[in-house]
């Protein structure tokens, strides 16, 4: 079940990828008896973010929910209590955007898994690309150092074409200033480490294939500025 609590502008996303026609086409109809049994007799409530970090998509949120990922980006408040953080949506803090930003990728992933239920050959369904980088994913770096981000080991098991996107996950790290990334949409990108000693910078490789549906995988690079 993909059940999420949507409010305000998020309903626009639901109209496209979470309404009954989408579920009928991509999940319930023609995808075997298990998918056909998916009920639509209630309002999606929001337990899904608790489960989504268990899907190994490269964001490593299963190791620490506060890293942010398909399960949103919860923060500890008042001891052990957790609540949604605020990710920036068009420059404005929005606690709902911590999960909303991932919805298209989540829904496509679900649709692909439904296709697996009825594909009698591996080649008749799409599968997630594999995001890999050269070097360590957690590094200690110095201010002013040039860092090469190389995703050339990445591949797609279906031989689909891949698109690369590097971006700074500002809310997950403690470096809040925007860091310039050169060659942001290429396999090999680079940055200059900002002058923020004692801070942590999170960079995400977002890898997208051109299969049907488009599927994404990720690789998180954490730079600890010394």
Each language-model region and where it sits:
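Proline-centered linker/hinge motifs at extracellular inter-domain junctions
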Residues: 122-137, 162
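Low-complexity "stalk/linker" and mucin-like segments enriched in Ser/Thr/Pro/Ala/Gly
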Residues: 131-138, 168-194
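Acidic, Ser/Thr
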Residues: 150-158, 167-169
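Exposed beta-strand face motif in extracellular beta-rich ectodomains
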Residues: 199-203
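Short, solvent-exposed loop/turn segments at the edges of extracellular beta-sandwich modules
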Residues: 208-214
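Extracellular and select intracellular beta-sandwich modules with Ser/Thr-enriched
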Residues: 214-221
């Amino acid at each position: 079940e993909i059940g999420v609590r949507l409010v305000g502008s998020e309903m626009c996303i639901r109209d496209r990828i979470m309404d009954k026609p989408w579920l009928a086409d991509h999940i319930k109809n023609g995808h075997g008896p298990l998918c056909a049994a998916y009920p639509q007799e209630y309002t999606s409530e929001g337990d899904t973010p608790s489960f989504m970090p268990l899907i190994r998509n490269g964001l490593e949120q299963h190791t620490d929910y506060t890293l942010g990922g398909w399960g949103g980006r919860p923060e500890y408040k008042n001891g052990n209590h957790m609540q949604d953080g605020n990710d920036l949506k068009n420059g404005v803090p929005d606690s709902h955007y911590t999960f909303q930003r991932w919805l298209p990728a989540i829904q496509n992933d679900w649709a692909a898994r439904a296709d697996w239920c009825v594909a009698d050959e591996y080649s008749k369904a799409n599968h997630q690309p594999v995001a890999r980088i050269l070097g360590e994913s957690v590094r200690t770096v110095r201010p002013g150092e040039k860092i090469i981000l190389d995703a050339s080991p990445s591949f797609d098991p279906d031989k689909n074409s891949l698109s690369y996107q590097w971006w700074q996950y500002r809310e997950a790290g403690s470096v809040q200033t925007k860091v310039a990334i050169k060659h942001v949409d290429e396999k090999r990108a680079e940055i200059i480490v900002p002058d923020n000693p004692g801070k942590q910078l999170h960079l995400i490789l977002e890898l997208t294939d051109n299969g049907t549906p488009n599927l994404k995988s990720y690789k998180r690079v954490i730079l600890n500025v010394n």
